[in-house]
């Protein structure tokens, strides 16, 4: 989530928030509290992975914010699966694949 003076800046901050490491928190205590409130609230809905139901719908919520004028507020939200944006796969000459960033995943199974 990005919160800023304009929607353009909010969109940029939202992308920055999406790329933060999972489990990190905003340095601002109020923003960190809002991250936790949003994460708990979204998980309480019970959507689960891919909307199939379950206890957890999100792995985390990150908020990046900047100073803004009280009369305007730009908010942008980026959503993305962690596995879609972080990973490194190595192929050998026989096209065997190894995911060195996710050691528990066997791509050749």
Question: At which residue positions do the language-model features occur?
Answer:
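Non-transmembrane, aqueous-exposed alpha-helical and coiled segments at domain scale
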Residues: 3-109
């Amino acid at each position: 989530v990005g919160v800023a003076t304009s929607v353009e800046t909010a969109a940029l901050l939202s992308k920055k928030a999406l790329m933060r490491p999972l489990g990190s928190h905003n340095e601002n205590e109020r923003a960190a509290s809002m991250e936790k409130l949003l994460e708990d609230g979204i998980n309480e809905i019970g959507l689960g992975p891919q909307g199939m139901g379950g206890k957890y719908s999100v792995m985390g919520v990150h908020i990046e914010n900047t100073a803004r004028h009280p009369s305007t507020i730009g908010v942008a939200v980026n959503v993305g699966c962690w596995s879609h944006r972080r990973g490194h796969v190595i192929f050998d000459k026989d096209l065997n694949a190894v995911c060195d960033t996710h050691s528990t995943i066997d791509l050749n199974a």
